[in-house]
């Protein structure tokens, strides 16, 4: 089966200061499952400072699927990469960056390179159409699930006025 490279990008406004948004987005852990549209179980293995492997178990159509991702976090640039090690998008890579947009707001800048197997060779126009569809789906997930969850989570009051650990603040933040 041929493989196509789907290149796409989008920006998503966030109702949070850049540092808080970055910390929230890169605080990966086992409680992330409710973020996703389908049932997901997550484990995190920290390899080194700023490098980790996420292992997600999903159940599309009732069948178990394991997806591992290598994540590299760069706090100085408020960015991270997510490279699929296996699963349906093996070797696909996604780049995220949080950019300040004033003192209380920020935006996510996303660049994706999704490598997908297709049943036959596609024309340039067909590849462009698939890339646009993928971009709409990913940006829609951020718009509908993650951005609102981030805003809700960071707005939630801390118990007894103490700073909450990010993991507790995230509750069950939305999807991608």
Task: Describe the function of each predicted region.
Residues 1-49, 176:
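Hydrophobic ligand-binding cavity/cleft-lining segments
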Residues 20-25, 70-71, 108-110, 142:
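Hydrophobic pocket/interface hotspot
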Residues 15-19, 89, 137:
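A generic structural signal for alpha-helix starts
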Residues 34, 59-109, 113-117, 171-176:
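Hydrophobic-ligand binding "helix-grip"
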């Amino acid at each position: 089966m041929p493989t196509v490279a789907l290149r796409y990008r989008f920006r998503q406004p966030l109702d949070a200061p850049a540092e808080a948004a970055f910390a929230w987005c890169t605080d990966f852990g086992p409680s992330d499952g409710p973020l996703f549209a389908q049932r997901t179980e997550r484990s995190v293995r920290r390899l080194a400072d700023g490098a980790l492997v996420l292992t997600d178990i999903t159940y599309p159509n009732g069948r178990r699927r394991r997806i591992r991702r290598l994540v590299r976090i760069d706090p100085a640039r408020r960015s991270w990469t997510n490279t699929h090690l296996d699963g349906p998008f093996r070797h696909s890579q996604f780049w995220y960056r949080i950019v300040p947009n004033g003192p209380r707001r920020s935006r996510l800048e996303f660049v994706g390179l999704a490598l997908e197997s297709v049943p036959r060779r596609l024309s340039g126009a067909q590849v462009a159409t698939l890339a646009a569809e993928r971009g709409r789906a990913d940006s829609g997930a951020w718009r509908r699930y993650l951005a609102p969850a981030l805003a809700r989570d960071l707005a939630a009051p801390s118990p007894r006025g103490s700073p909450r650990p990010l993991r507790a603040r995230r509750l069950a933040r939305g999807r991608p």
